[in-house]
């Protein structure tokens, strides 16, 4: 897939290629090459797609029709414009060892950072710091929304959306300590987000969980 500023995106959570939006797809492919080298060689290197560097410094490279190596955003632009290269990504979606790397990187880049993020809220003029979001939110529905927002908005963007809703509902419920926040009505928090958010992407992600049947209990 290719959209917005991402240049090129791929995978079940749409890892993004462009550096401007985090370049998570670079890290995914680097993880694939490190942890599943044979499959990466057979599927990606075979068509000229490779990686350089590791972790946050990882970049994807590709050999163009003239044998010139493009890297980073230039590589993603070239891949985006050459539909024949899409086949490698489609094939990777059916290779278990490479699918496993999607799960690994989704957990590393989004799930754990979101659930372990420190949340600052203000209740009745008192500022409280929740050490980890997962100390307060425990239901399958709430955690699904939090992770979905972190993927779409970034962990910082997710927290900026979540904090005022927590503050509002906690004030209404008179929950004035971190321990008391564990009794918060999780569904009401996200109903507040739907009622106050201006970003349709946020609203749609919350509503999709509301409509999924996942439990807030």
Language model: regions and residue ranges:
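Cell-wall polysaccharide-cleaving catalytic domain and substrate-binding groove, primarily
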Residues: 1-217
């Amino acid at each position: 897939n290719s959209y917005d500023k991402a240049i090129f995106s791929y995978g079940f959570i749409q890892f993004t290629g462009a550096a401007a939006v985090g370049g998570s797809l670079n890290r995914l492919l680097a993880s694939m090459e490190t942890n599943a080298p044979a499959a990466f060689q057979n599927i990606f290197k075979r068509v000229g797609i490779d990686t350089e560097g590791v972790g946050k410094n990882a970049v994807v490279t590709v050999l163009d029709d003239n044998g010139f190596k493009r890297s980073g955003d230039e590589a993603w632009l070239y891949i985006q414009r050459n539909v024949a290269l899409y086949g490698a990504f489609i094939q990777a979606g059916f290779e278990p060892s490479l699918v496993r790397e999607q799960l690994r990187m989704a957990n590393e880049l989004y799930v754990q950072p979101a659930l372990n993020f420190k949340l600052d809220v203000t209740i009745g003029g008192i500022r409280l710091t929740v050490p980890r979001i997962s100390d307060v939110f425990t239901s399958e529905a709430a955690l699904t929304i939090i992770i979905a927002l972190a993927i779409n908005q970034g962990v910082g963007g997710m927290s900026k959306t979540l904090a005022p809703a927590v503050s509002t509902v906690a004030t209404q419920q008179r929950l004035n300590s971190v321990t008391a926040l564990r009794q918060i009505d999780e569904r009401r928090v996200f109903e507040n987000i739907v009622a106050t958010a201006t970003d349709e992407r946020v609203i749609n992600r919350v509503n999709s969980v509301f409509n999924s049947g996942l439990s807030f209990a």
